[in-house]
Curated annotation (Swiss-Prot):
Catalyzes the esterification, concomitant with transport, of exogenous long-chain fatty acids into metabolically active CoA thioesters for subsequent degradation or incorporation into phospholipids. Its main location: membrane. Keywords: ATP-binding, Fatty acid metabolism, Ligase, Lipid metabolism, Magnesium, Membrane, Nucleotide-binding. It is an enzyme of class 6 (ligase). InterPro entries: AMP-bd_C (IPR025110), AMP-bd_C_sf (IPR045851), AMP-binding_CS (IPR020845), AMP-dep_synth/lig_dom (IPR000873), ANL_N_sf (IPR042099), ATP-dep_AMP-bd_enzyme (IPR050237). Its cofactor is Mg(2+). It comes from Yersinia pestis. The gene is fadD. This is Long-chain-fatty-acid--CoA ligase. GO terms for molecular function: ATP binding; long-chain fatty acid-CoA ligase activity. GO terms for biological process: fatty acid beta-oxidation. It is a peripheral membrane protein.
Length: 562
């Protein structure tokens, strides 16, 4: 496909980037730490951590992994925590030790956590005490030999940290009892690590930096193998696309999305580290009043988020009174940005809310709306520099402009494959091209629009939910005969999970089924709607047809609207 989008690029956005500007993320980080040593790198709960402190602490962390635990280059280390100052310390500590980061959603259930730890082969985990009870239930079933435990306030000043830890544990009671007798504290790791020798590993760009887990149409979470080069390429692509709105050494980005999410990891963390920017870490973005209070204290220049977050902010009275004069860049990703939200954002802030599109397998950025956009486009934008895309029909032929086809992507940000899953890798990677499973159209200027998802994936507030996983959990209930799961439109989260159930026992109630689901599934995966039916639509070979159920929902919605 001809790169028609290049002619729509702003004049100062290059067609290509240098994916090998740095030899590794280690070199990128160490250069930034030297260049911006005394400037703030991260802010959390009023505590400021400079680049110098981050360099010293991550070096100590790396040294302890190497000397204290005896871990080797290529070992996998899991990180399971929300946005705290401990996260970037551990992140860059693991990378600087030559090891591989395995990001884990701290809200995972024991079942989900066990799968990710076992599949990745993680030998160590860094976890915040709030979620230690989950780890306790499964750690003995995994290869994890070392547990590094931290508390919410452990990187705050002594007085503030003590207060935060007391409130979290005894007032809010957010730390359920756990028993991990061999765990070592994060503080002890840093104290001992400072006295140990750090040995800089021989890491090159093609080495793996992350196993970033994503679901699949089978419902089994798979680790996307992302190299140092993949991540650096995406960092450079984002920087090239939005450089005119960025000011190295002077930006402050609001980080409400969790850093374990690939979007925040690449854009908010890695990109703004390279740029010498400050990242304002929001630990609990669900507390909108608390978040707005934090925002009122800082003249932020950039913010990223999902549609759900922007909508919640716009509906907070205090947020509408903030000063947006310093804001230059607003980026929405993870789920479609709704027109009403984008227009309200522009009216309030005077800045466009630029929608982008990506997927874990692409580190994640694939497309983004240009920074000189004049109005909401409803599209996912243009392919970022050094990215090639094509739209193919079911026979593998390229479609004409304006016609729908499956979106395929090629570029330096595309993963190596799925960890230890060659068959799954072969299903999506062909001659360097990645099949996204999304159906899109492209106009004459190169703007892409997603019109459908080939996969059955449901997108809840930017998080992927896979029907098979939910159906497997529902099937564990003795009173369920069969079920089917689909996504339905939801004003708050974009989509919500709906489950259709054929009962095996007439006494089954929606409340009973949802209680069962909450035992096995993270909150955003738990169905919001339960509908009981006598039978489910099936193909002639007995396969349940989710498509028919989705079509029924569309018809009902259309009828209701009429």
């Amino acid at each position: 496909m001809e790169k028609v989008w290049l002619k729509r690029y702003p004049a100062d956005v290059p067609a290509e980037i240098d994916p090998d500007r740095y030899s590794s993320l280690i070199e990128m980080f160490e250069n930034a730490a030297l260049r911006y040593a005394d400037q703030p790198a991260f802010i959390n709960m009023g505590e400021v951590m400079t680049f110098r402190k981050l360099e010293e602490r991550s070096r100590a962390f790396a040294a302890y992994l190497q000397q204290g635990l005896g871990l080797q280059k290529g070992d996998r280390v899991a990180l399971m925590m929300p946005n705290l100052l401990q996260y970037p310390i551990a992140l860059f500590g693991v990378l600087r030790a030559g090891m591989i980061v395995v990001n884990v959603n701290p809200l995972y259930t024991p079942r989900e956590l066990e799968h990710q730890l076992s599949d990745s082969g993680a030998v160590a985990i860094v976890i915040v005490s709030n979620f230690a009870h989950t780890l306790e239930k499964v750690v003995f079933k995994t290869q994890v030999r070392h547990v590094i435990l931290t508390r919410m306030g452990d990187q705050l000043s002594a007085a503030k940290g003590t207060l935060v830890n007391f409130v979290v544990k005894y007032i809010k009671r957010l730390v359920p009892k756990y028993y991990l007798p061999d765990a070592i504290s994060f503080r002890t790791v840093l104290q001992k690590g400072r006295r140990m020798q750090y040995v800089k590993p021989d890491v090159i760009n093609t080495d793996t930096a992350f196993l970033q887990y994503t679901g699949g149409t089978t419902g089994v979470a798979k680790g996307a193998i992302l190299t140092h080069r993949n991540m650096q390429s995406n960092l450079e692509q984002a920087k090239a696309a939005y450089a005119p709105l960025l000011q190295p050494g002077r930006d402050l980005v609001v980080t409400a999305l969790p850093l374990y999410h690939i979007f925040a990891l690449t854009v908010n963390c890695l990109l703004f580290i390279e740029l010498g920017g400050r990242s304002l870490l929001i630990t609990n973005p669900r507390d909108i009043p608390g978040m707005v209070k934090e925002l009122s204290r800082y003249p932020f220049t950039a913010i990223t988020g999902v549609n759900t977050l922007f909508n919640a902010l716009l509906n907070n009275e205090e947020f509408t009174h903030l000063d947006f004069s310093t804001l230059r860049l607003s980026v929405g990703g993870g789920m479609p940005v709704q027109k009403a939200v984008a227009e309200k954002w522009e009216t309030l802030t005077g800045k466009h809310l630029l929608e982008g599109y990506g997927l874990t397998e692409c580190s994640p950025l694939v497309t983004g709306n240009p920074y000189d956009l004049k109005h909401y486009s409803g599209s996912i934008g243009l392919p970022v520099p050094s990215t090639d895309v094509r739209l193919r029909d079911d026979d593998g032929n390229d479609v004409e402009l304006g016609k729908p086809g499956e979106l395929w992507v090629r570029g330096p940000q595309v993963m190596l494959g799925y960890w230890q899953r060659p068959d799954a890798t072969d299903d999506v990677l062909k001659d360097g091209w990645l099949a996204t499973g999304d159906i899109a159209t492209m106009d004459e200027d190169g703007f892409l629009r997603i019109v459908d998802r080939k996969k059955d994936m449901i997108l809840v507030s930017g998080f992927n939910v896979y029907p098979n996983e939910i159906e497997e959990v529902v099937a564990l209930h003795a009173k369920v005969l069969e079920s089917a799961v689909i996504g339905v439109p939801n004003e708050v989260s974009g989509e919500a999970v709906k489950v259709f159930v054929v009962k095996n026992d007439a006494s089954l109630t929606p409340e009973e089924l949802l209680t069962h689901c909450r035992r096995y599934l993270t909150g955003y995966k738990v169905p919001k709607i339960v509908e009981f039916r006598d039978e489910l639509p099936k193909s002639n070979v007995g396969k349940i047809l989710r498509r028919e159920l989705r079509d029924e929902e569309v018809k009902v919605g259309t009828t209701d609207a009429a």
